[in-house]
Structures are given as structure tokens and as C-alpha cells.
Design a protein with these regions (language model features):
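Conserved acidic segment of CheY-like receiver
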Residues: 2-16, 20-22, 33, 52-53
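Helix N-cap/capping motif at the beta->alpha junctions
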Residues: 33-42, 63
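Conserved phosphotransfer cores of two-component systems
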Residues: 45-47, 70-76, 97-98
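Receiver (REC) domain active-site loop signature in two-component systems and cognate sites
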Residues: 58
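Alpha4 helix (beta4-alpha4-beta5 surface) of REC/receiver domains from two-component response regulators
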Residues: 65, 86-102
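C-terminal output helix
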Residues: 89, 108-117, 121
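C-terminal output/effector regions of signal-responsive regulators
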Residues: 128, 132-154
């Protein structure tokens, strides 16, 4: 069986954060980086991304605004918000508007973030498997309904 891809999109306007993240995690995952929400949307349109990690405070569009803006077009990726600022209102917005899986404070602990990312990939995988099983159930249910109608008509 083919291993599932482990693609992460990390968005941060600070290049040194992107470089450090990629250096820390590239041996475990395929990392795509973007310096803006616009670049992030472009990568999402081109690549199969399972995890989106974004900084909250960026020029032009906050992390929460970005995550909320992509929900309709990209509903499946698991979302993680990184921020250097604790703000209750942002946490609430992140959960309610951005459907954030985890809210993590900077500076992050590499080992803890890796565990969070691994858990996020597990959640993604389980959701994907559930979706496929539901499609299979619907197909089988439709077949059974058809067979029942055929039997009732004969």
C-alpha cells in the first residue's frame, strides 16, 4: 500500500521563521512555504496539502482571516495557527471562523509541535478514510434499494 503524502503548507511573513521551520521538519514531511496569504492560496491550488500552519499576525490578512477565506475551496486540510501573542478573541475567532485544530504559541517547542503535526496527520487520515467509507456505504445502500425495488416489482 502506498504511503499517504505528508504535505504541509507553512505561511509566515517572516522569512527566518519559514527557513527555521523547514530546516526542523523537512526530514519528516514535505514542506511548502509562503510569505503571504496570496502565495498560500496559490500553493493550495497547485499542491495536495494535508496540513496548513499559518502565523496569525501578517500584513494584509491575518492567519484567521486566511483560514476562514479558504474553507469553502479547501475544506479538508487540518489547520494550525501559530502566534507570538496570546489573545482570547483571536483564539475564539480561530476556532469558530478558521476551524483551527490547534492554536500554538511562539516560540514553539519542536518536539511538541511534531507531536501536534503527527496527530493532525492522523486526524486527516481518519477523516479521509471515513469519507471514503461513507461513499461506499451510500453506493451499497443505493444498490440495495435498487434490488429491493426490482424484487417488489416482480
Amino acid at each position: 500500500m502506498e504511503a499517504s503524502p505528508k504535505n504541509i503548507l507553512y505561511i509566515d511573513d517572516e522569512v527566518h521563521n519559514l527557513t527555521a521551520f523547514k530546516a526542523n521538519f523537512r526530514r519528516y514531511y514535505t514542506i511548502f512555504t509562503a510569505e503571504s496569504a496570496f502565495e498560500g492560496k496559490k500553493i493550495l491550488a497547485e499542491k495536495n496539502i494535508q496540513i496548513i500552519i499559518t502565523d496569525q499576525r501578517m500584513p494584509g490578512m491575518t492567519g484567521v482571516e486566511f483560514l476562514a477565506s479558504i474553507i469553502n475551496d479547501f475544506p479538508d486540510p487540518i489547520r494550525i495557527l501559530l502566534t507570538g501573542y496570546a489573545d482570547t478573541e483571536t483564539v475564539i475567532e480561530a476556532i469558530n471562523k478558521g476551524q483551527v485544530y490547534r492554536y500554538i504559541m511562539k516560540p514553539f517547542n519542536e518536539a511538541e509541535l511534531k507531536i501536534t503535526i503527527d496527530n493532525a496527520f492522523e486526524v486527516y487520515s481518519l477523516r479521509d478514510e471515513n469519507k471514503k467509507l461513507m461513499e461506499k456505504v451510500l453506493t451499497i445502500n443505493n444498490q440495495l434499494e435498487f434490488m429491493l425495488r426490482q424484487r417488489l416489482l416482480s
